C-alpha cells in the first residue's frame, strides 16, 4: 500500500469564506499516483472546516447566513471564550461544518456523487492555516 501526504496552505483576507479546493485535491491525487484507495482532507486548525457540498453561490450565501444565525459573531461579549480573541463563533461554526472529509479513489479519480465538491471553510481568517491531504491505496 502507498501513502501520500501534502499540506495545503491558506491565508484568507476576510473573516469568513468558502473555497472550492477540489482542483487542489485532484492535483494531489494525480501526484500520488494512487489509483484505488481513500483521500482524507482535514482542516488542521480549530476555526476552519473541510466539507463536501455543491459549488453554488446561492448555497454558500445560505450557509453563511445560517451559520451567522446559529453562532453570531456579535456581540462578542456573549461568549466566555472571547478573552484575548473574538473568535468563539468561529469555533462553533467549525463544529457545525465539520473537520474533515474522506473520499473514495476509483480508477485514479475522486469518486463523487452528483455535484459534490470539496470546500475549505474559513471562519476566522486573516491568518495562515493549513489543510492536510492524506491519500492511501494502490
Where do the model's predicted regions map?
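Active-site histidine-anchored catalytic micro-motif
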Residues: 1-138
Amino acid at each position: 500500500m502507498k501513502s501520500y501526504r501534502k499540506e495545503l496552505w491558506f491565508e484568507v483576507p476576510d473573516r469568513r469564506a468558502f473555497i472550492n479546493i477540489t482542483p487542489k485535491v485532484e492535483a494531489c491525487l494525480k501526484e500520488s499516483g494512487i489509483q484505488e484507495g481513500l483521500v482524507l482532507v482535514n482542516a488542521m486548525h480549530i476555526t476552519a472546516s473541510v466539507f463536501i457540498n455543491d459549488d453554488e453561490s446561492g448555497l454558500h450565501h445560505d450557509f453563511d447566513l445560517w451559520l451567522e444565525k446559529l453562532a453570531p459573531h456579535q456581540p462578542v461579549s456573549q461568549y466566555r471564550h472571547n478573552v484575548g480573541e473574538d473568535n468563539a463563533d468561529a469555533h462553533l461554526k467549525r463544529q457545525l461544518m465539520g473537520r474533515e472529509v474522506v473520499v473514495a479513489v476509483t480508477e485514479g479519480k475522486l469518486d463523487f456523487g452528483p455535484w459534490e465538491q470539496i470546500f475549505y471553510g474559513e471562519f476566522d481568517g486573516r491568518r495562515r492555516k493549513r489543510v492536510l491531504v492524506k491519500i492511501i491505496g494502490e
